Amino acid sequence: MYFLRQLNCGRRYIGTHKKNKIEQIMLWKITQNFLTTIVILYTGLHWGICAAPGVYLFLNIFQNTANYSNFERAMLIGVSIGVGYVLWMLSTIFLTSILSFILKPSIGSVRVPFLSITSIRWGFLNVLDRLAKPCIHHMVPSWVTDFYYRSLGCTIGKGSFVSSDRINDPYLVSIGENTVIGSKVIITPHLAEKNELVFAPIKIGNNCLVGLGAQINPGCEIGDGAVIASRAIVPKYTTVPAGEVWGGIPAKLIKKK
């Protein structure tokens, strides 16, 4: 009888545990769908506000060129559309920079549950970053994108050259002096693991070269003077010693300088 009572208690515990887990999943899905809807609506608002300077320029030129010849009017309106597009990109970058600067979290190496305030805050920052990404793509490398990354907390040393629009979570990335980050390099200081978001800062030293399309994963440290070959994937929590050349998938030592 004692055994049967214990067995029934065990079954009730398992049933309750499964029920709680299902409820947590449902709560997460409801929260996710609600926040996604808010984000979709906000996207239109964000891009719409940033489009206002370009639209204002277009309307002024359109209204003030009514008496011009068709050729002159077409040229001026065409220029207003082109300049308006550039104004939209710059406005998007600067508005996103301001909001991200205000909202960026002060975190280091940490694990947080998917359903947490930190995760939601990180998700919204990710959305802001994605709104700016199409504009960053057309602006790298330039002082504009350096300003953007720095305003989001990224450390970029003197004389460094950042040519990638794929630096995620910039507030967890540190780039030393006289370092070159090639085009399409992916730098990602976070990953999803066991129902948690894992954040691990990435540090790239001085006088480094990260080649075209390479990927640097969470927790990596690239020593001074190191070279990461094009298309290489550096596994998470890897330390590349100073002065070494790494390449391949996964990246391994090729040679020492």
Task: List where the protein language model places each region.
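Glycine-rich hexapeptide-repeat left-handed beta-helix
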Residues: Y2-R5, C9, S183-H190, K194-K257
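Residue-level marker of positions within ordered structural domains that often coincide
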Residues: S100, D165, A251
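Glutamate identity and glutamate-enriched acidic tracts
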Residues: E23, E72, D129, E177, ...
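A short alpha-helix capping/helix-coil boundary motif
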Residues: G123-L125, T155, I202
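Terminal amphipathic alpha-helical/low-complexity segments used for targeting or macromolecular assembly
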Residues: M1-R150, K257
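Left-handed beta-helix
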Residues: A132-T188, K194-N195, A200, A214, ...
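Glycine-centered flexibility motif
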Residues: S97, S106-V110, G153, G182, ...
